[in-house]
């Protein structure tokens, strides 16, 4: 089958990019590819058998028109000016059989006009982390970009240490960012901002294209998608780590995996990025930061969208987030109905977990084994303050009994939303260290495991992290 690529971005937004081709690495070699995703995208298996090829930027497929996008943004709450694809190149937009499209974005593809002081490269460590994280999020059911392939090489890349240069092929329906809009707003070019909005609506919100109120309805949906995404992050214990406006997807996808982390111990103020000295992007601050970022996006639209309409959409954010979050947390607790005491029970559990630094993922997974008429719980042994747990657990069981649902039905629901496996940093680090020594076994094994996060396991993937694996420091360097 011949893959079809179109050039909408090139043709319709000529002032938003620079056309250029990737710069190949030295002795590049393909070490992993996503066979399931490739099959979904109808990519012939032969493309993965001919060396690095397109996956290493050595060749282009017919119809590709590579480019680097320009955008700007606020970083850590401060206007950073022009940014852009400093090491990534959008190779092309694949047209799928159902009419939808998928961007092919090659990360680590070399210098671009937007590289600033960088070298245009990515390292093996960061490409492995992003491939694992994006696939983990996908199989958890959370909107995200996807990873299609990883190429490593003999090219040295200088970060804190010398690391192997690598490339990641990332795919997504769109790479439109809040920062695209900010770029032209701060250049005082509101018509270019409107062109971006029209492009987004035309191709991703086409049902609104002919509506006279299209901008208000579109922005309201961007707000709702963002609120839903953040709610889902919070329920699985995911911390993004660098929620700058240029890392915010217009489509509500998880974008740009850098110093991310899943909670080990339940720590509301968890900071996964060791460069985040003020805790701006801490786990519990993510909902507020996302709203702040939406406010920055709204500002860019204010020249042609009524401020009252923008504020109305922004005002809906908290309720949408709380609705999604509440629904999912009730499912995680096994509640089939909504009762007035639900929030209190959840908050008391969180308080107990925070005091004892309970493992977030294991606690909810073990809670899924609860039998409503039995005071015994395997979770009890996880707590030091048994009296406090017993008090909470007795009230929790009484609450379960109100729903008049069998244990088996409730447990099935809970186990479908409480993963046994999340991508803990130590698991990623173990795969990285092996890969850097030339052994890709753990990389492939972990990728396979992450495809089934809700399945019971009895290996170390679902155990508590070892002492060395807790509080691993992760930086923005990639």
UniProtKB/Swiss-Prot annotation:
The keyword Cytoplasm does not apply. The keyword Magnesium applies. It is an enzyme of class 2 (transferase). Mg(2+) binds at residues 247, 256. Its EC number is 2.7.7.-, 2.7.7.108. This is Protein nucleotidyltransferase YdiU. Keywords: ATP-binding, Magnesium, Manganese, Metal-binding, Nucleotide-binding, Nucleotidyltransferase, Transferase. HAMAP family: YdiU_SelO. The active site is at 246 (proton acceptor). Its cofactor is Mg(2+); Mn(2+). Belongs to the SELO family. It comes from the Bacteria. Nucleotidyltransferase involved in the post-translational modification of proteins. It can catalyze the addition of adenosine monophosphate (AMP) or uridine monophosphate (UMP) to a protein, resulting in modifications known as AMPylation and UMPylation. It comes from Escherichia coli O7:K1 (strain IAI39 / ExPEC).
């Amino acid at each position: 089958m011949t893959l079809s690529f179109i050039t909408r971005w090139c043709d319709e937004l000529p002032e938003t990019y620079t056309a250029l081709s990737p710069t190949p690495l030295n002795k590049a070699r393909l070490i992993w590819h996503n066979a399931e995703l490739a099959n979904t995208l109808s990519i012939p298996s032969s493309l993965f058998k001919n060396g690095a090829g397109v996956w290493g930027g050595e060749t282009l497929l017919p119809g590709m028109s590579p480019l680097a996008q320009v955008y700007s943004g606020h970083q850590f709450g401060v206007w950073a000016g022009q940014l852009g694809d400093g090491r990534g190149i959008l190779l092309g937009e694949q047209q799928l059989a159902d009419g939808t499209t998928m961007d092919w974005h090659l990360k680590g593809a070399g210098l671009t006009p937007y590289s600033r002081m960088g070298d245009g490269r990515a390292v093996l460590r960061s490409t492995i982390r992003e491939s694992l994280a994006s696939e983990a999020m996908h199989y958890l059911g959370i909107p995200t970009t996807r990873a299609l392939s990883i190429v490593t090489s003999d090219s040295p890349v200088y970060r804190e240490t010398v690391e192997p240069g690598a490339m990641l092929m990332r795919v997504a329906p769109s790479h439109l960012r809040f920062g695209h809009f900010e770029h032209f707003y701060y250049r005082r070019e509101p018509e270019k901002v409107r062109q971006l909005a029209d492009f987004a609506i035309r191709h991703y919100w086409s049902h609104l294209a002919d509506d006279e109120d299209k901008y208000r309805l579109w922005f309201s949906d961007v707000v709702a998608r963002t609120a839903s995404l953040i709610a889902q992050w919070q329920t699985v214990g995911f911390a993004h780590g660098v929620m700058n406006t240029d890392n915010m997807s217009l489509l509500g996808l998880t974008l740009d995996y850098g110093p991310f982390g899943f909670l080990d111990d339940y720590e509301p103020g968890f900071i996964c990025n060791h460069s985040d000295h003020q805790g701006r992007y801490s786990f519990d601050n993510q909902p507020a930061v996302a709203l702040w970022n939406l406010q920055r996006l709204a500002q860019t639209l204010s020249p042609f969208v009524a401020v009252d309409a923008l504020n109305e959409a922004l005002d809906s954010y908290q309720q949408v987030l709380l609705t999604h979050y509440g629904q999912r947390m009730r499912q995680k607790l096994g509640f089939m109905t909504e009762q007035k005491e639900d929030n209190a029970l959840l908050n008391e559990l969180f308080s107990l977990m925070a005091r004892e630094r309970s493992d977030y993922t294991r606690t909810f997974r073990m809670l899924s084994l609860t039998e409503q008429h039995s005071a015994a719980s395997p979770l009890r042994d996880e707590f030091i303050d048994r009296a406090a747990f017993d008090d909470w657990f007795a009230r929790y069981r009484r609450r379960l009994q109100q729903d008049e649902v069998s244990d088996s039905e409730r447990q099935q629901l809970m186990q479908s939303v409480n993963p046994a496996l999340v991508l803990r940093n130590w698991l990623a680090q173990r795969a990285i260290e092996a890969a850097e020594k030339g052994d890709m076994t753990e990389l492939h094994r972990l990728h396979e495991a992450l495809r089934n996060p809700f399945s019971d396991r009895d290996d170390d993937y679902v155990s508590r992290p070892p002492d060395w694996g807790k509080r691993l420091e992760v930086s923005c360097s990639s």
